[in-house]
């Protein structure tokens, strides 16, 4: 089967190619697609090298599936052209998501909506995907009335330029103080910045132009993802509202989001508060989450060695096998290793290159009649983008549309 990956040289595009190979999608011919300046570059896949071609050339090759991650403008122009030659398009951009004629799909939740005539299918926003995978089964069982979510979104969501920028800031290549200096001396502020200013306060060097963010990201948090709207919300925040309604097929769910960019890699974190229409118990919530497809429960905040008994039992010891790799100093002693094996909650560093949505810190919300708080983490380049897109292609395959 011919499969095109549009945006093959970007962070998400490279992950799409990786996931296609990992999941053994039946690709007989890979068509890596990028801009004219990348034409001729080589992409490795299944032990072979494949040449990058232009979108126009790719359309003429008539692939069965084209997975897009090249931005809204490219999707707007080229998705219909691929669809016109009976190629199914799975688009990771925001362009088609809220189009009433297009399906917006998380396979674990609403794969049933895909019909044979759906030649353009939208991939949801990364932050929406991980939240809904975590809570969709809870909604089926207890009916969610309201969601309050704050996101902690890693820099890879902005692309390679953001990764390079954070590296440069941390390596003191652009005037940013090193962490040690910053902790000792503090960070000077630059108080003069017009509404259109896209400069960053960077230590004693003052303001320097930045390519990825309006302000320094290292040692900082930016409550600003995508453009601000007249309401004061950002487009990223409204994506979570609108996409939740469309995917869950329930416009009555109230969604109140705040999205924040954080200087980490590995995945996005989300603090999620849910209010339900029906009564819940923690035991029932844990049982539901354990059975939720795509979710790995990592919630052991009261290890055995603590004097307080953990009423929820031991969850997912698998993380215990991973923890000592990253905390080698603490795990040198038997006691340290035992502690790390038992204490568990989701963290971005462990989500990297994984496809699960990790859920933890589950607890009742005492301020409402029926509600919980939870924390979820997922690799935004994988389940938040590439893996979800490939899973949609797998649905097309399972339905024998391709």
Name the predicted role of every residue range.
Residues 266-270:
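Conserved glycine-rich beta-strand-loop-beta hairpin in the small C-terminal domain of fold type I
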Residues 212-214, 218-262:
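Oxyanion-binding "anion nests"
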Residues 283-292:
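Short amphipathic alpha-helices in soluble, non-transmembrane regions
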Residues 121-130, 232-241, 384-388:
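A glycine-rich, Thr/Ser-enriched phosphate-binding loop motif common to dinucleotide/cofactor-binding enzymes
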Residues 1-197, 203-217, 252-254, 301, ...:
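N-terminal Rossmann-like NAD(P) cofactor-binding subdomain of oxidoreductases
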Residues 342-350, 354-364:
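Short glycine-rich, acidic/polar surface loops and turns
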Residues 260-263, 378-383:
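Glycine-rich phosphate/pyrophosphate-binding beta-alpha loops
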Residues 36-38, 126-127, 151-158, 221-229, ...:
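Glycine-rich beta-alpha junction loops
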């Amino acid at each position: 089967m011919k499969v095109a990956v549009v945006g093959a040289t970007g962070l998400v595009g490279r992950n799409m190619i990786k996931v296609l190979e990992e999941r053994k999608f039946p690709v007989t011919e890979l068509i890596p697609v990028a801009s004219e300046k990348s034409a001729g570059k080589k992409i490795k896949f299944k032990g072979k090298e494949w040449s990058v071609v232009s979108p126009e050339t790719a359309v003429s090759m008539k692939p069965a599936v084209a997975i897009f991650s090249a931005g809204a403008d490219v999707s707007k122009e080229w998705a219909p052209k691929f669809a016109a030659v009976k190629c199914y398009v799975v688009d990771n951009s925001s362009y088609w998501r809220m189009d009433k004629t297009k399906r917006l799909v998380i396979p674990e939740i609403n794969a049933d909506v895909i019909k044979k005539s759906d030649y353009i299918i939208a991939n949801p926003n990364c932050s929406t995907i991980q939240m809904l995978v975590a809570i969709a089964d809870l909604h089926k069982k207890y009916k969610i009335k309201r969601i309050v979510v704050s996101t902690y979104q890693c820099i890879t969501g902005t692309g390679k330029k953001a990764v390079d920028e954070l590296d440069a800031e941390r390596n003191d290549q652009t005037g940013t103080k090193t962490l040690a200096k910053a902790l000792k001396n503090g960070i000077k502020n630059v108080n003069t910045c017009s509404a259109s200013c896209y400069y960053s306060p960077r230590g004693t060097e003052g303001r320097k132009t930045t390519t990825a963010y309006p302000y320094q990201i290292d040692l900082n948090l930016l409550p600003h993802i995508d453009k601000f709207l007249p309401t004061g919300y950002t487009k990223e925040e409204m994506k979570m509202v609108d996409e939740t309604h469309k995917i869950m097929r329930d416009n009555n769910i109230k969604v109140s989001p705040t999205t924040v960019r954080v200087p980490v890699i590995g995945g996005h974190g989300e603090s999620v508060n849910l209010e339900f229409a029906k009564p819940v118990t923690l035991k029932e919530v844990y049982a539901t989450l354990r059975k939720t497809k795509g979710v790995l429960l990592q919630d052991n905040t009261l290890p055995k060695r603590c004097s307080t008994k953990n009423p929820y039992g031991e969850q997912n010891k698998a993380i215990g096998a991973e923890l000592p790799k990253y905390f080698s100093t603490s795990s040198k002693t038997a006691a340290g290793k035992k502690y790390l094996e038992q204490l568990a909650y989701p963290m971005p560093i462990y989500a990297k290159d994984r496809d699960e949505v990790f859920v933890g810190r589950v607890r009742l919300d005492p301020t409402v009649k029926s509600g919980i708080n939870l924390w979820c983490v997922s690799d935004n380049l994988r389940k938040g983008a590439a893996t979800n897109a490939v899973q949609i292609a797998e649905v097309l395959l399972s339905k024998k549309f391709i």
